[in-house]
A protein has these predicted regions:
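Sequence/structural segment immediately N-terminal to covalent heme-attachment motifs in c-type
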Residues: 38-62, 71-89
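Flexible coil segments in periplasmic/lumen-exposed cytochrome c-class electron-transfer proteins
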Residues: 10, 14-46, 50, 97-136
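Peptidyl-prolyl cis-trans isomerase
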Residues: 65
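Interdomain boundary/hinge segments at the C-termini of tandem beta-sandwich modules
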Residues: 5-9
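Conserved beta-strand positions that form and line the central face of beta-propeller blades
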Residues: 4, 68, 95-98
Length: 136
């Protein structure tokens, strides 16, 4: 099988790489993809570390006016809609901000992470499709 090489300018190559990166990101964040718990937890840990840990702490215990996620009735609840609504809309007059700017996959991942971290070992996972439906 012959190999074909196409020589392009640096600008064209950079544009091509950017396009391929967008394609990969779009595939990775397909809200119809069905995830397994281990993969959602791994992604959720990254989302939590980036967006949540400053207030809720690495321990999930929160502090002061910041509610604990570890042992939280909302987090432990089998009704995912309660936690989804808080992440999409915020709560407590803005003390808990809305995170609706995050992708469905990132939101599903961080919810699944909180449901299965610390003492919260629910075995529950939230799929991105649940977030997509809740946004409508």
């Amino acid at each position: 099988m012959p190999i074909h090489v196409k020589v392009v300018s640096a600008a064209d190559y950079t544009a091509w790489v950017a396009g391929k990166n967008k394609e990969m990101s779009a595939k990775a964040d397909d809200p119809s993809k069905v995830w397994v718990l281990a993969d959602l937890k791994a992604r959720g840990e990254k989302v939590y570390s980036t967006n949540c840990v400053a207030c809720h702490q690495a321990s999930g215990k929160g502090g002061g006016a910041i509610k604990a996620l570890d042992g939280s009735a909302v987090v432990m609840d089998a009704d995912h809609g309660k936690q989804i609504a808080i992440l999409l809309n915020g709560a407590n007059n803005g003390a808990m901000p809305s995170w609706k700017a995050l992708s469905e996959t990132d939101l599903a991942a961080v919810i699944s992470y909180t449901k299965n971290n610390w003492s919260n070992q629910t075995g529950q996972l939230v799929q991105p499709a649940e977030l997509q439906a809740a946004r409508k």
